């Protein structure tokens, strides 16, 4: 009986803890704390297009001059606390960061990422219509470029699922200055000739699924006469930009994040 009681306690603990563990797909307390301490102005705006309302985070740099726009595409975990903190970090570096929640209107009662039940975000993101995603991104970019603080220059970046979307976005957006793809898959090779902007890749050494796509991407982009510059960070795992700044980050992810961030800032400033 005692053993049965102990087992029941363990089972109940797992069941009660499951929502908390699953909720971490979009919730990072350490990232939220950093956002709350940020001195930069941020605001939520509703970007409307084609009957859709896309809730979008805009974070402004502390600058007297007009600055480039960086369109941020979130991971498969939705517009998480970390994605919002990353937008703030871009603003700290001097860029007008715009991060649309691509799950806007898709959650319970028409909510966005933070309204989904535990474990529901990844499935919802994976089912998003690619054309809807592109339309949402175009609308957010168009909105941002019209802001008085914008200087007309547009970059796009994405992570994980969003990395793939940033690469895909480059096939349809002709006014991009550059696309920054963090550990995301490439678009089909027959779409690569449409790309006009240089594409810079950031990949993890311990990410066989995505790394396996790099050789064909190199050859496909070369055949299309496009600029593609991938860098792989040894020892890092998929998602190192987020994992590398978490309190429990391993050294390889920390180093990869630092090196990638320095490279990224250099490219943005070039």
Regions found by a protein language model. Give the residues of each.
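Acidic catalytic loop of the alpha/beta-hydrolase fold
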Residues: 206-211, 238
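Short alpha-helix in the alpha/beta-hydrolase fold that links the catalytic acid
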Residues: 86, 211-221, 230-233
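Bacterial N-terminal signal peptides
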Residues: 7-18
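Primarily recognizes the serine-hydrolase "nucleophile elbow" in alpha/beta-hydrolase
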Residues: 137-196
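Serine-hydrolase catalytic machinery in alpha/beta-hydrolase-like enzymes
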Residues: 31, 35-38, 44-145, 242-245
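C-terminal catalytic histidine-bearing segment of alpha/beta-hydrolase fold enzymes
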Residues: 222, 227-270
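Short beta-to-alpha linker loops that shape the active-site pocket of alpha/beta-hydrolase fold enzymes
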Residues: 102-106, 185, 236
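Short beta-strand/loop motif that positions the catalytic acidic residue
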Residues: 195, 201-203
